[in-house]
Amino acid sequence: MFGHNYIDFWASSKSSEVNFHPAILEAHHSDINLIAITADRPARLRKTGANQTTDQVGIYKLIKTHDLASEIDLKPLFTGKPIHLNIQFSEPLISEERNDWLAGIKIDPVEYKSGVGGKLETSKGVLIIGHDNAGYTSDEINTFASKLKWPVIAENPLSYPQSHPYAALYLADPKVRQALAPENVIVIGRTTLSRSINEFIKLAKNLIVIDPRVADVDNNRQANLLLQSLPSDVSSELTTIDIWQKSSELASAEVKKLTWSEQAAINCICDCLTSMSALFVGSSRPVRDIEAFTKFENKIL
Protein backbone atom coordinates (compact mmCIF):
# COMPACT_ATOMS: atom_id res chain seq x y z
CA MET A 1 0.00 0.00 0.00
CA PHE A 2 1.32 3.43 -0.94
CA GLY A 3 -0.84 5.25 1.60
CA HIS A 4 -4.20 6.96 1.43
CA ASN A 5 -3.32 9.94 -0.79
CA TYR A 6 -3.34 9.68 -4.57
CA ILE A 7 -0.35 8.34 -6.48
CA ASP A 8 0.11 9.65 -10.01
CA PHE A 9 2.02 8.50 -13.09
CA TRP A 10 2.54 10.28 -16.40
CA ALA A 11 2.83 9.43 -20.08
CA SER A 12 3.83 11.89 -22.77
CA SER A 13 4.03 9.80 -25.95
CA LYS A 14 1.14 8.40 -27.94
CA SER A 15 1.98 4.76 -27.30
CA SER A 16 3.39 4.68 -23.80
CA GLU A 17 0.00 5.22 -22.15
CA VAL A 18 -1.14 1.76 -23.23
CA ASN A 19 1.47 0.34 -20.85
CA PHE A 20 -0.57 1.70 -17.94
CA HIS A 21 -3.34 -0.87 -18.44
CA PRO A 22 -1.97 -3.49 -15.99
CA ALA A 23 -1.54 -0.90 -13.21
CA ILE A 24 -5.00 0.53 -13.85
CA LEU A 25 -6.56 -2.93 -13.79
CA GLU A 26 -4.91 -3.62 -10.42
CA ALA A 27 -5.97 -0.20 -9.09
CA HIS A 28 -9.56 -0.80 -10.19
CA HIS A 29 -9.82 -4.18 -8.48
CA SER A 30 -7.97 -3.02 -5.35
CA ASP A 31 -9.74 0.36 -5.21
CA ILE A 32 -6.37 2.14 -4.95
CA ASN A 33 -6.13 5.92 -5.27
CA LEU A 34 -4.30 6.14 -8.57
CA ILE A 35 -4.16 8.94 -11.17
CA ALA A 36 -3.18 8.20 -14.75
CA ILE A 37 -2.10 11.46 -16.39
CA THR A 38 -1.68 11.48 -20.16
CA ALA A 39 -0.43 14.41 -22.23
CA ASP A 40 -2.48 15.12 -25.34
CA ARG A 41 -2.68 17.58 -28.22
CA PRO A 42 -5.67 19.96 -28.44
CA ALA A 43 -9.04 18.36 -29.24
CA ARG A 44 -9.36 20.49 -32.39
CA LEU A 45 -6.52 18.51 -33.97
CA ARG A 46 -8.19 15.13 -33.55
CA LYS A 47 -9.18 13.40 -36.79
CA THR A 48 -7.44 16.08 -38.87
CA GLY A 49 -4.45 14.06 -39.96
CA ALA A 50 -2.19 15.83 -37.45
CA ASN A 51 0.53 13.73 -35.88
CA GLN A 52 0.26 12.37 -32.32
CA THR A 53 -3.54 12.57 -32.16
CA THR A 54 -4.42 9.11 -30.86
CA ASP A 55 -7.82 9.37 -29.17
CA GLN A 56 -6.93 9.00 -25.49
CA VAL A 57 -10.35 9.88 -24.07
CA GLY A 58 -11.80 6.74 -22.49
CA ILE A 59 -8.75 4.66 -23.38
CA TYR A 60 -8.95 3.03 -19.94
CA LYS A 61 -12.42 1.48 -19.96
CA LEU A 62 -12.50 0.63 -16.25
CA ILE A 63 -11.97 4.18 -14.95
CA LYS A 64 -13.38 7.60 -15.71
CA THR A 65 -11.52 9.98 -18.04
CA HIS A 66 -11.52 13.73 -17.45
CA ASP A 67 -10.48 15.48 -20.68
CA LEU A 68 -8.98 18.83 -19.62
CA ALA A 69 -8.17 21.79 -21.85
CA SER A 70 -7.98 24.53 -19.22
CA GLU A 71 -7.21 25.07 -15.57
CA ILE A 72 -9.77 23.56 -13.17
CA ASP A 73 -10.04 22.65 -9.49
CA LEU A 74 -9.04 18.98 -9.39
CA LYS A 75 -10.02 18.29 -5.79
CA PRO A 76 -13.68 17.38 -6.54
CA LEU A 77 -12.43 14.71 -8.95
CA PHE A 78 -10.59 12.83 -6.21
CA THR A 79 -13.42 10.66 -4.89
CA GLY A 80 -11.35 7.73 -3.67
CA LYS A 81 -11.33 5.92 -7.03
CA PRO A 82 -8.64 5.57 -9.70
CA ILE A 83 -9.07 8.26 -12.38
CA HIS A 84 -7.60 9.31 -15.73
CA LEU A 85 -6.67 12.92 -16.46
CA ASN A 86 -6.11 13.59 -20.16
CA ILE A 87 -4.36 16.97 -20.41
CA GLN A 88 -4.54 18.90 -23.69
CA PHE A 89 -1.47 21.05 -24.33
CA SER A 90 -1.50 23.92 -26.81
CA GLU A 91 1.53 25.76 -28.13
CA PRO A 92 3.59 27.46 -26.88
CA LEU A 93 4.46 24.55 -24.60
CA ILE A 94 7.21 26.49 -22.83
CA SER A 95 6.43 29.83 -21.23
CA GLU A 96 8.61 32.80 -22.11
CA GLU A 97 8.55 33.95 -18.47
CA ARG A 98 11.85 33.50 -16.69
CA ASN A 99 10.38 33.33 -13.19
CA ASP A 100 10.61 30.13 -11.23
CA TRP A 101 7.04 28.92 -11.74
CA LEU A 102 7.38 26.46 -8.86
CA ALA A 103 8.33 29.18 -6.37
CA GLY A 104 5.74 29.73 -3.69
CA ILE A 105 3.79 26.53 -4.35
CA LYS A 106 2.41 25.11 -1.14
CA ILE A 107 0.89 21.65 -0.98
CA ASP A 108 -1.67 21.07 1.74
CA PRO A 109 -1.61 17.46 2.95
CA VAL A 110 -4.87 15.57 2.58
CA GLU A 111 -6.09 14.00 5.80
CA TYR A 112 -7.23 10.40 5.50
CA LYS A 113 -10.67 9.58 6.90
CA SER A 114 -10.49 5.91 7.69
CA GLY A 115 -14.13 4.85 7.67
CA VAL A 116 -13.88 3.34 11.14
CA GLY A 117 -17.09 3.41 13.12
CA GLY A 118 -20.26 1.58 14.06
CA LYS A 119 -21.05 -1.28 16.41
CA LEU A 120 -20.68 -5.04 16.04
CA GLU A 121 -22.20 -7.64 18.36
CA THR A 122 -21.21 -11.27 17.89
CA SER A 123 -20.21 -14.40 19.81
CA LYS A 124 -17.17 -16.66 19.25
CA GLY A 125 -15.26 -17.03 16.03
CA VAL A 126 -12.10 -16.46 13.99
CA LEU A 127 -10.84 -13.24 12.38
CA ILE A 128 -9.24 -13.58 8.94
CA ILE A 129 -7.33 -10.63 7.46
CA GLY A 130 -6.89 -10.53 3.70
CA HIS A 131 -3.56 -9.42 2.28
CA ASP A 132 -4.99 -6.08 1.07
CA ASN A 133 -6.35 -5.07 4.52
CA ALA A 134 -9.48 -3.71 2.76
CA GLY A 135 -7.60 -0.42 2.63
CA TYR A 136 -7.22 -0.10 6.40
CA THR A 137 -3.92 0.36 8.20
CA SER A 138 -2.49 -2.51 10.21
CA ASP A 139 -2.83 -0.34 13.34
CA GLU A 140 -6.57 0.08 12.73
CA ILE A 141 -7.02 -3.64 12.21
CA ASN A 142 -4.86 -4.55 15.21
CA THR A 143 -7.04 -2.30 17.37
CA PHE A 144 -10.17 -4.01 16.06
CA ALA A 145 -8.64 -7.47 16.62
CA SER A 146 -7.74 -6.65 20.23
CA LYS A 147 -11.37 -5.71 20.90
CA LEU A 148 -12.70 -8.82 19.17
CA LYS A 149 -10.63 -11.28 21.26
CA TRP A 150 -10.66 -14.02 18.61
CA PRO A 151 -7.93 -16.13 17.02
CA VAL A 152 -6.43 -14.28 14.04
CA ILE A 153 -5.31 -15.59 10.66
CA ALA A 154 -3.54 -13.08 8.42
CA GLU A 155 -2.51 -13.45 4.80
CA ASN A 156 0.23 -10.99 5.73
CA PRO A 157 1.43 -12.47 9.04
CA LEU A 158 4.42 -10.11 9.16
CA SER A 159 2.19 -7.20 10.22
CA TYR A 160 0.00 -8.87 12.85
CA PRO A 161 1.59 -9.97 16.13
CA GLN A 162 -1.48 -11.90 17.29
CA SER A 163 -1.87 -13.87 14.05
CA HIS A 164 -1.23 -17.61 14.11
CA PRO A 165 1.61 -18.45 11.69
CA TYR A 166 1.55 -21.31 9.19
CA ALA A 167 -2.27 -21.43 9.19
CA ALA A 168 -2.35 -21.83 5.41
CA LEU A 169 -0.28 -25.00 5.84
CA TYR A 170 -2.17 -26.88 8.53
CA LEU A 171 -5.60 -25.78 7.30
CA ALA A 172 -4.80 -27.64 4.07
CA ASP A 173 -5.61 -30.82 6.04
CA PRO A 174 -9.42 -31.38 5.87
CA LYS A 175 -9.45 -33.00 9.33
CA VAL A 176 -7.69 -30.00 10.87
CA ARG A 177 -10.09 -27.61 9.13
CA GLN A 178 -13.07 -29.49 10.53
CA ALA A 179 -11.59 -29.58 14.03
CA LEU A 180 -11.03 -25.81 13.99
CA ALA A 181 -14.27 -24.91 12.16
CA PRO A 182 -15.76 -21.82 13.84
CA GLU A 183 -19.31 -20.65 14.38
CA ASN A 184 -18.45 -17.19 13.05
CA VAL A 185 -15.81 -15.89 10.68
CA ILE A 186 -15.04 -12.23 10.07
CA VAL A 187 -13.09 -11.52 6.89
CA ILE A 188 -11.43 -8.14 6.41
CA GLY A 189 -10.67 -7.44 2.75
CA ARG A 190 -10.13 -10.14 0.16
CA THR A 191 -8.61 -13.56 0.79
CA THR A 192 -7.03 -14.45 -2.53
CA LEU A 193 -3.79 -16.24 -1.66
CA SER A 194 -4.69 -19.56 -0.08
CA ARG A 195 -7.23 -22.19 -1.11
CA SER A 196 -7.00 -23.79 2.33
CA ILE A 197 -8.05 -20.61 4.11
CA ASN A 198 -10.92 -20.06 1.69
CA GLU A 199 -12.07 -23.64 2.28
CA PHE A 200 -11.91 -22.95 6.01
CA ILE A 201 -14.07 -19.84 5.59
CA LYS A 202 -16.76 -21.96 3.90
CA LEU A 203 -17.13 -24.02 7.09
CA ALA A 204 -18.36 -21.06 9.13
CA LYS A 205 -22.05 -21.01 10.03
CA ASN A 206 -22.05 -17.21 9.89
CA LEU A 207 -19.80 -15.10 7.66
CA ILE A 208 -19.22 -11.37 8.17
CA VAL A 209 -17.26 -9.41 5.57
CA ILE A 210 -15.75 -5.99 6.30
CA ASP A 211 -14.68 -4.13 3.16
CA PRO A 212 -15.62 -0.66 1.85
CA ARG A 213 -15.56 -2.05 -1.70
CA VAL A 214 -18.77 -4.04 -1.19
CA ALA A 215 -20.56 -0.75 -1.91
CA ASP A 216 -19.42 -0.65 -5.54
CA VAL A 217 -16.44 -2.64 -6.84
CA ASP A 218 -17.46 -5.89 -5.08
CA ASN A 219 -21.22 -5.29 -4.92
CA ASN A 220 -21.96 -8.95 -5.71
CA ARG A 221 -19.94 -10.29 -2.79
CA GLN A 222 -21.85 -12.78 -0.64
CA ALA A 223 -21.94 -13.07 3.17
CA ASN A 224 -24.43 -13.21 6.03
CA LEU A 225 -23.45 -9.64 6.87
CA LEU A 226 -21.60 -7.10 4.73
CA LEU A 227 -20.06 -4.08 6.45
CA GLN A 228 -18.56 -1.10 4.66
CA SER A 229 -16.67 0.19 7.70
CA LEU A 230 -14.52 -1.30 10.44
CA PRO A 231 -16.57 -1.27 13.67
CA SER A 232 -15.13 0.78 16.51
CA ASP A 233 -17.54 -0.58 19.14
CA VAL A 234 -17.16 -4.36 19.43
CA SER A 235 -18.97 -6.81 21.70
CA SER A 236 -17.93 -10.46 21.41
CA GLU A 237 -17.09 -13.60 23.39
CA LEU A 238 -13.51 -14.56 24.17
CA THR A 239 -12.47 -17.46 21.94
CA THR A 240 -9.73 -19.75 23.20
CA ILE A 241 -6.56 -19.80 21.14
CA ASP A 242 -4.92 -22.88 22.71
CA ILE A 243 -5.63 -25.26 19.84
CA TRP A 244 -4.49 -22.64 17.32
CA GLN A 245 -1.24 -22.10 19.20
CA LYS A 246 -0.60 -25.84 19.34
CA SER A 247 -1.29 -26.21 15.62
CA SER A 248 1.14 -23.40 14.82
CA GLU A 249 3.81 -24.90 17.08
CA LEU A 250 3.55 -28.28 15.36
CA ALA A 251 3.73 -26.63 11.94
CA SER A 252 6.71 -24.54 13.04
CA ALA A 253 8.63 -27.67 14.02
CA GLU A 254 8.08 -29.09 10.54
CA VAL A 255 9.02 -25.84 8.79
CA LYS A 256 12.34 -25.80 10.65
CA LYS A 257 13.18 -29.15 9.06
CA LEU A 258 13.07 -27.68 5.56
CA THR A 259 16.29 -27.87 3.59
CA TRP A 260 17.31 -25.02 1.28
CA SER A 261 14.28 -23.88 -0.71
CA GLU A 262 12.45 -20.72 -1.72
CA GLN A 263 10.47 -20.97 1.53
CA ALA A 264 13.66 -21.14 3.57
CA ALA A 265 15.03 -18.22 1.56
CA ILE A 266 12.10 -15.93 2.35
CA ASN A 267 12.44 -16.78 6.04
CA CYS A 268 16.13 -15.93 5.87
CA ILE A 269 15.37 -12.59 4.19
CA CYS A 270 12.78 -11.68 6.83
CA ASP A 271 15.14 -12.64 9.65
CA CYS A 272 17.88 -10.39 8.25
CA LEU A 273 15.78 -7.24 7.93
CA THR A 274 16.68 -4.33 10.16
CA SER A 275 14.19 -2.49 12.35
CA MET A 276 11.36 -0.63 10.54
CA SER A 277 12.26 -2.06 7.15
CA ALA A 278 10.02 -1.71 4.11
CA LEU A 279 9.67 -5.06 2.35
CA PHE A 280 8.44 -5.11 -1.26
CA VAL A 281 7.17 -8.52 -2.35
CA GLY A 282 6.27 -9.75 -5.81
CA SER A 283 2.94 -11.35 -6.60
CA SER A 284 2.13 -15.03 -7.10
CA ARG A 285 4.57 -17.42 -5.39
CA PRO A 286 6.69 -15.02 -3.24
CA VAL A 287 3.72 -13.47 -1.45
CA ARG A 288 2.26 -16.93 -0.86
CA ASP A 289 5.55 -18.08 0.66
CA ILE A 290 5.32 -15.21 3.13
CA GLU A 291 1.72 -16.08 3.98
CA ALA A 292 2.43 -19.75 4.62
CA PHE A 293 5.98 -19.89 5.93
CA THR A 294 6.73 -16.73 7.95
CA LYS A 295 5.61 -15.26 11.24
CA PHE A 296 5.27 -11.79 12.75
CA GLU A 297 8.37 -9.61 12.74
CA ASN A 298 8.00 -6.32 14.62
CA LYS A 299 10.74 -4.80 12.47
CA ILE A 300 8.67 -4.98 9.26
CA LEU A 301 7.23 -1.67 8.15
Predicted regions and their residues:
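Thiamine diphosphate
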Residues: M1-A43, V287-L301
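Glycine-rich phosphate/diphosphate-binding loops that line cofactor/substrate pockets in enzymes
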Residues: M1-N5, K75-T79, V116-G125, F144, ...
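Conserved thiamine diphosphate
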Residues: H4, D40-R44, T48-P82, D242
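Glycine-rich, anion-gripping cofactor-binding loops and their flanking helix/strand elements
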Residues: S12, I129-I208, D216, F296-L301
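Short gly/pro/ser/thr-enriched loop/turn and capping motifs at secondary-structure boundaries
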Residues: S16-V18, R41-R46, P92, L158-Q162, ...
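Conformationally flexible catalytic loops at phosphate/diphosphate-handling active centers
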Residues: P76-T122
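A short, well-structured juxtamembrane/interface segment
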Residues: E111-E121, Y136-S138, V176-A179, K256-C272, ...
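Phosphate/pyrophosphate-binding active-site segments
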Residues: I201-V287
